[in-house]
């Protein structure tokens, strides 16, 4: 009977990453909701966070962080 609990826990851990795939950005509305813009190419300070459709990528503006040395 205990093996059922172990198998259930194993399957839960094994299949949990697949739940994130349904949260992918794949439309203009989802892109804008995440603070992105639909562009043909993500250039400069924009980085790709998803796709709007087959031609456009969802790009988000990101300011590079200053690297500080820890003394």
Swiss-Prot record:
The keyword Thylakoid does not apply. It holds the Pfam family Defensin_beta. Its main location: secreted. Keywords: Antibiotic, Antimicrobial, Defensin, Disulfide bond, Pyrrolidone carboxylic acid, Secreted, Signal. GO terms for biological process: defense response to bacterium. The modification Pyrrolidone carboxylic acid is found at residue 23. Residues 23-25 form a propeptide. One of its GO terms (cellular component) is extracellular region. Residues 1-22 form the signal peptide. SUPFAM superfamilies: Defensin-like (SSF57392). It is found in: Secreted. It comes from the Eukaryota. Disulfide bonds join 31-58, 38-52, 42-59. InterPro entries: Defensin_beta-like (IPR001855). Belongs to the beta-defensin family. LAP/TAP subfamily. Has bactericidal activity. This is Beta-defensin 7. The gene is Defb7.
């Amino acid at each position: 009977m205990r093996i059922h609990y172990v198998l259930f826990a194993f399957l839960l851990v094994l299949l949990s990453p697949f739940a994130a795939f349904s949260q992918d950005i794949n439309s203009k509305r989802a892109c804008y909701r995440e603070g992105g813009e639909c562009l043909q190419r993500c250039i400069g300070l924009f980085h790709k966070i998803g796709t709007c459709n087959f031609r456009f990528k969802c790009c988000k503006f990101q300011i590079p962080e200053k690297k500080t040395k820890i003394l």
